[in-house]
Amino acid sequence: MNPGTTNFVHGFPFVAISLGLIYKKRPVLGVIYNPFLDYLYTGIKGHGSHLSKNKNPPQKLPLSTPRPLPSLSQALIAVEWGSDRSQTVAGSKAESFLRLAGDPNHTSPVKGGRMAHSLRSMGSAALNFSMVAQGGMDMYWYVIAHLMFAPLYEGLLCAGK
């Protein structure tokens, strides 16, 4: 999972160290740490997820009760361009992001547009997932341009079923 290497090189403080533990083919533990902000996200199967900020006691996630999300037009969505900027990958992502953010009712409409409230790119997949867990973002729109690798990505993300 992208920890925000480019962010680190540029001194942008959205960087993470992320670890996941799978036991008997099941995710049981996840840890994401942002050393610049001193935020530690933890998730332990059967014990929930927590955020510890600046050495303070852990807070249960999400930090606030999630509000109902009736449509994408009210959603704050995390997206990432990634490091593969080939025509195939960048083109797939650009098309997906355009449909996600585009206005289908504009005088120059975006075909298939869903008019999401806003898209954000933090530069770290690990922190995007953390912000969703925290309640700071509504979802992470993860585009896999090469679908033949989808099972591999599932394992890398410690995804459960």
Task: Label the predicted regions.
Residues M1-K161:
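IMPase-like, lithium-sensitive Mg2+-dependent phosphomonoesterase catalytic core
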